[in-house]
């Protein structure tokens, strides 16, 4: 008779990808929010099409107006339908600190991310500065508990993004990408896809992937 350990050994290990998106009012300018919506769908489709023995999972968070929301719970990409993916509308302020607390809660919850899961990848994209008190929640996320071990990537869009804060957020300097427009958003998400794909095909998915940023031109 098969033991519980045999069953667990056969079940694919989860690899969580957690995306936090800025949907504040400034994201409406120059088609940034539309590019973000397209890029998220393309990322999920690309990961869904990848043949892997890893249980790749995606969760979507966002912040804008006066709130931060969990828009899509952590779900295996194989089970995500296109009509389930949220379409973001840009408005209001940039309450980024609330999102840090929400992501922290998810990562520390072993009912959602079990101990056997691979280290999460956290992706943050923003074109502005937090309008709430983010310092405590970001410190908790990046320095304490299981979340401190996550791979953290970020994109700063335009000159108004808080570059210094994002430099502190990412787990390595190479994971901070600066962009200026909608085209750069799509290129960044390609980079995220390549980095995650590198991990799921690696013999050691918990080791930091070293993937060069794509330097080809991408037309939306």
Where do the language-model regions lie?
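Switch/connector loops and helix/strand junctions flanking conserved nucleotide-binding motifs
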Residues: 26-29, 67-72, 131-134, 161-167, ...
